[in-house]
């Protein structure tokens, strides 16, 4: 047992005189011989601070009469500490130190929290320390989840390796200077846990047996699924896997246009024919949810019947639907509403929850995640099978690329394990990295029980504090009158309602307890100006508190632009010089994530940087001082320019080019589909495509996805027509091209676009034009008739 701690929450200080303190010191010394450190806390507040921050805690000794500051409550200090243990820990061994005559007067709930009682002066120090150490060892042993426990057990056996990988527990690295450097950096334990699937004791990832299978079953229980699969290549592989399993060639798939590119890859692999569903957008350019009306059966039928690709489908009914939940900017659906709306249109529903693996573990998100849809919440034969793909590493504690697929199957679309496992193995590897499996196992264990709720609650609480702090500082600046009144804002409700009293409160003044416990405070009320989305219904969508969007002056949520503006790209360029890297930057907004790793010091540093930026802007500081690397890289463009001048020039360009307006039009008016994505991919790999300048790209068929970041959503999918030169898509891309030329160093991140080496022109991949007779034949094959199935007629839908 190593790195374990025992809390002594007792009245006596470590240096106190008296026989009781002396006996406690003897017990402490005995515990050290068992490899246990003691943290001493002499007040309830100190003890609770240790409980919040000491992750190595393995046992606690709590004095019932521990003092605490007067709070007006009836609890003793010891009672407060015990309640805190119950809220935060599952089965932590707690010994209550009290006089024997006090037992009959203790509340009944105390016996449910403690595992025993101590009278320090009535037993010897070695005996008491042995009891505590034994309980701590048992707690640590039971704390470990199935796979991680088995991996540690195997490592402790120190067996010789006669199997892959060839580095043999890291030994091979020690035979080379550079290898030795690698070994020293990562350490022997990591390298010895990099094992082969030949180690039967650890089970099989492909067969889901042994400790691996036990870990997946445990994850299914914790995440609320009937079946869970561990995936070691990220949520992108999860998306491809589920899409490849759920829909086959020439079947119809309903696809949220606000989807990740991996969803498209699944369509390419399966040969499905996509029908896109269009989300709302607001004045900031942020993508909203799919409106409820978009999911209704009549609307889906209308989109399907108008889509040329469905003319050649094997059935007019969609076999699969996929939505992003939550969105990149933190918008979460009522998943039961979504499932009920889409149930008449598809038997399989996939929620891509890459950024939302924590949702089940906090009451704010109740009913907002895929696995909330099951036989208990949606009884009856209409319920669709639900898949949830989660990038565990993004917002929980797991190694990069560690992900999970959760499944709640329904009778109308059964998911037989043997069939799904074929897709799983097709997208998996026979050489898994065992530390990644262990990290998924540990991430699951961290979320299991009250500790998981506490971890997510801390992230929510810190996000709320930051949100309120930004607004309060803005108000103080406006009230001071000694400086320009502007400051950054936060995209969030301006006021909230306390359901207990009906009182309407400014968001910045609302009690943090209300904001972290009442989901209605975060719901997008229909047609509220602060969010700028239309067509929503009550309770349909919720803003995730931990995804914080900072807003810059220049535009509001309904798209009204002001004379003064600070484009967010300039802000994030400055933040980068302060070693602050944000998650996403749009024209006038920037996204930051409050994960479990966020601390007050971390967001306090961000707040200080925002204040410094304001001061530099107000004093018209030169760019050489703020962004020296930018000026050095482009001296002819930025030398002599000030921060305020750059912001204003960029703001005027965005306004005059109507970039935000063009963005909305490009995303709302979908290009016309011409051919399935799989056909374009086949042309791509056989040299049947070419890169085309925007000026020559009118009415061409795209061969690759074009995704603009910001906002990170596809504007053009493979198989779609680019439209006219003055159409919404090419006008928008041309405006981006113009922006990049005028503001070097602030280039848009546009996937699917390359730059001409001689001119810097945008180039997009298009299907090479073919003679008319070949075009007619291709159109006939891909629009009017399904691809021939060599295995016979297709299976019945559903």
Describe every region a protein language model picked out:
Residues 2-31, 39-40, 60, 95, ...:
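Conserved acidic segment of CheY-like receiver
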Residues 9-18, 42-44, 62-66, 97-100, ...:
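Structural motif
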Residues 12-14, 96-103, 354-363:
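Short beta-alpha junction loops
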Residues 19-25, 44, 56-89, 98-105:
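Conserved phosphotransfer microenvironments
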Residues 41-44, 49-53, 67, 237-248, ...:
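Conserved PLP-enzyme active-site core in the AAT-like
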Residues 52-55, 102, 110-204, 221, ...:
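Non-catalytic terminal extensions of PLP-dependent enzymes
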Residues 84-85, 338, 342, 610:
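Hydrophobic positions in alpha-helices of CheY-like receiver
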């Amino acid at each position: 047992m190593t790195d374990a701690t025992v809390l002594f929450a007792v009245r006596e200080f470590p240096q106190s005189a008296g026989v009781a303190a002396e006996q406690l010191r003897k017990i402490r010394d005995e515990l050290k011989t068992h490899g246990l450190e003691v943290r001493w806390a002499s007040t309830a507040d100190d003890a609770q601070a240790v409980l919040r921050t000491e992750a190595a805690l393995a046992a606690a000794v709590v004095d019932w009469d521990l003092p605490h500051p007067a709070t007006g409550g009836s609890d003793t200090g010891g009672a407060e500490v015990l309640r805190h243990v119950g809220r935060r820990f599952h089965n932590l061994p707690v010994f209550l130190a009290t006089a024997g005559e006090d037992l009959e007067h203790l509340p009944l709930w105390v016996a449910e929290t403690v595992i025993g009682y101590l009278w320090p002066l009535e037993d010897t120090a070695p005996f008491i320390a042995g009891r505590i150490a034994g309980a701590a060892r048992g707690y640590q042993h039971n704390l470990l989840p199935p796979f991680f426990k088995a991996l540690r057990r195997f490592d402790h056996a120190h067996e010789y390796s006669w199997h892959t990988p060839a580095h043999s527990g890291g030994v091979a690295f020690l035979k080379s200077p550079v290898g030795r450097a690698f070994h020293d950096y990562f350490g022997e334990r990591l390298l010895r846990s990099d094992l082969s699937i030949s180690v039967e004791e650890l089970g099989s990832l492909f067969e889901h047996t042994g400790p691996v299978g036990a870990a997946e079953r445990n994850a299914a229980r914790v995440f609320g699924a009937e079946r869970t699969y561990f995936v070691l290549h990220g949520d992108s592989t999860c998306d491809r896997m589920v899409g490849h399993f759920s829909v086959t060639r020439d079947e119809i798939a309903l696809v949220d246009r606000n989807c990740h590119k991996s969803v498209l890859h699944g369509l390419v692999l399966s040969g499905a024919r996509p029908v896109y569903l269009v989300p709302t957008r607001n004045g900031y350019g942020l993508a909203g949810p799919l409106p409820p009306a978009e999911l209704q059966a009549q609307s889906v039928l209308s989109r399907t019947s108008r889509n040329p690709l469905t003319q050649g489908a094997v059935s007019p009914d969609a076999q699969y639907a996929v939505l992003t939940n939550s969105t990149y900017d933190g918008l979460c659906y009522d998943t039961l509403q979504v499932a009920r709306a889409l149930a008449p249109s598809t038997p399989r529903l996939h929620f891509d929850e890459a950024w939302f693996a924590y949702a089940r573990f906090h009451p704010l998100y109740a009913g907002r995640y895929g696995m909330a849809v099951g036989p208990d919440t949606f009884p009856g034969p209409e319920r669709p099978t639900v898949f949830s793909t989660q990038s565990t590493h993004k917002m929980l504690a797991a190694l990069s690329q560690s992900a999970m697929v959760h499944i709640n199957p329904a009778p109308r679309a059964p998911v037989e394990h043997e069939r799904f496992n074929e897709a799983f193995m097709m997208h998996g590897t026979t050489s898994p990295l065992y530390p990644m499996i262990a990290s998924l196992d540990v991430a699951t264990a961290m979320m299991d029980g009250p500790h998981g709720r506490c971890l997510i609650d801390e992230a929510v609480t810190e996000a709320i504090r930051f949100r309120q702090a930004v607004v309060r500082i803005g108000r103080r600046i406006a009230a001071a009158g000694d400086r320009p009144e502007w400051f950054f804002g936060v995209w969030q409700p301006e006021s909230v309602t306390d359901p207990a009293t009906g009182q309407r409160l400014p968001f910045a003044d609302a009690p943090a307890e209300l904001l972290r416990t009442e989901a209605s405070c975060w719901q997008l009320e229909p047609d509220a100006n602060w969010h700028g989305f239309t067509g929503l219904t009550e309770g349909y969508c919720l803003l995730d508190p931990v995804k914080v969007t900072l807003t810059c002056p220049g535009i509001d949520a309904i798209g009204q632009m002001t004379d003064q503006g600070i484009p967010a790209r300039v802000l994030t360029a400055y933040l980068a010089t302060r070693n602050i890297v944000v998650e996403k930057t749009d024209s006038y907004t920037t996204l930051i994530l409050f994960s479990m790793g966020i601390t007050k010091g971390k967001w306090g540093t961000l707040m200080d940087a925002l204040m410094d930026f304001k001061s530099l802007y107000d004093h018209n500081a030169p760019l050489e001082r703020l962004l020296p690397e930018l000026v050095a890289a482009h001296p002819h463009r930025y030398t002599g320019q000030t921060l305020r001048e750059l912001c204003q020039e960029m703001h005027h360009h965005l306004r005059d080019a109507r970039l935000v307006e063009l963005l909305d039009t490009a995303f709302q008016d979908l290009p016309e589909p011409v051919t399935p994505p799989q056909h374009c991919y086949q042309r791509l790999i056989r040299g049947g495509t070419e890169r085309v300048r925007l000026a020559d790209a009118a009415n061409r068929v795209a061969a690759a996805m074009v995704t603009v970041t910001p906002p990170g959503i596809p504007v053009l999918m493979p198989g779609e027509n680019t439209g006219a030169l003055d159409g919404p898509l090419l006008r928008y891309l041309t405006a981006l091209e113009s922006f990049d030329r005028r503001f070097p160093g602030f280039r848009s991140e546009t996937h699917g676009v390359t730059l001409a080496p001689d001119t810097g022109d945008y180039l997009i991949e298009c299907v090479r034009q073919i003679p008319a007779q070949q075009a007619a034949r291709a159109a006939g094959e891909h629009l009017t008739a399904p691809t021939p199935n060599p295995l016979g007629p297709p299976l019945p839908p559903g």
